[in-house]
Amino acid sequence: MKIKRIRTFPITLQVRPDLYIVSSAGAHPVSKYVIVAIETDEGATGWGEASVVPLWSGETQGGAMALINDYFAPMLLDQRVDDYEELIKKVDGMLDNHFTKAAVEMALLDLVGKRRNCPVFEIIGGAKNPLEIPIKFSIGLREPRDTANIAAQKVREGFTAIKIKVGPDPEKDLRRVEAVREAIGPGVRLNVDVNGGWSAEQAIREIRRYEKFNLEYVEQPTPRWDIEGMAKVRKESGARIMADESVFTIWQAREVIAKQAADLISIYPGKNGGILKARKICELAESAGIVCHLGSNLEWDIGTAAMCHLAAACPNVRADRYPVDILGPLYYASHPAVDPICFRTGRVSVPTQAGLGVRISVPEIEALRDGREVTARSIFR
């Protein structure tokens, strides 16, 4: 099976107005993707997805498409799909561009799974976790009452964990967290995500003010580059700390571990440049006694499927203890995948079909690119 054609599709999806995310890193009312289709001489197609947010990774739709079409495609055309590991190494020769490289890797692994007639999680080590994964719901910087109402509704729907964005307005942040804790009760897991919006000194002060709300952990309290500051926050506040933006690469993970800056590390295929590299970070963290968690960049169905396979194959992803952020499709009204990812009662189902397990309709992808309406399909079953 050889690669014969590679296509890219720029897609823009509106986030549901009642749920779009605002954080210390900015607003996220619209999601931009690049969908990758790798086609073979045997008629198979592998699908990948890059969720590009310049404020997050520095990548853009135009840049991702240029990199794939002008650089990666010439490397991959006429190559054997079975040589996917070597092909991924070639793609990794380009610096940075983590989400773009992850999209190409997803498409290759999707093809390998289809060729072997097995799900991707079997290719990367087999299922080490249950195929029904506990997830949490994330709420942006909204008014305290609105945030509390959304959180209470999600708990009624079956979520057992809630994440709240905080950072730019300490007093309103405090009221927001207080309102949510009151609305969801003491038995629901609650954490806050600062998205690097605090200095180390401010983080220590604010975390102490949050002690009465029984937070499970604080995510990325300091800027991504300030790993020493995050270590100071962890030591002086006594809070459990999760590193997210600070860990794009395995070298950054090593630094976080060496400086004892985090109790948990957030991984996911896009941020880490692919499923395989995210798994390596997970294995490194496990050797250091640090649990891994899956974060999110509001992925669509393809990227969400990749996250599911990673979570299933990594025993150090303890979603039973720390429900994960596999939640992107919940934030969109339209789901043009033929068989969308299935969510139910605060859980997501890992696809078990061959490859990533998400079938894509090219006409519907084209319709989204052109900005036309696409028939919505329910993702709840």
Please place each PLM-identified region on the residue numbering.
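Structured beta-strand/loop patches that form or line metal/cofactor-binding pockets in enzymes
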Residues: 1-45, 50-55, 329-334
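Conserved, mostly hydrophobic/aromatic
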Residues: 3, 36, 43, 72, ...
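Hydrophobic faces of well-ordered beta-strands that scaffold small-molecule active sites
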Residues: 46-48, 133-139, 162-164, 188-194, ...
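Glycine-rich, aromatic-flanked loop segments that form ligand/cofactor-binding clefts
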Residues: 95, 105-140
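Metal-dependent enolase-superfamily TIM-barrel catalytic cores that perform enediolate-based chemistry
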Residues: 125-237
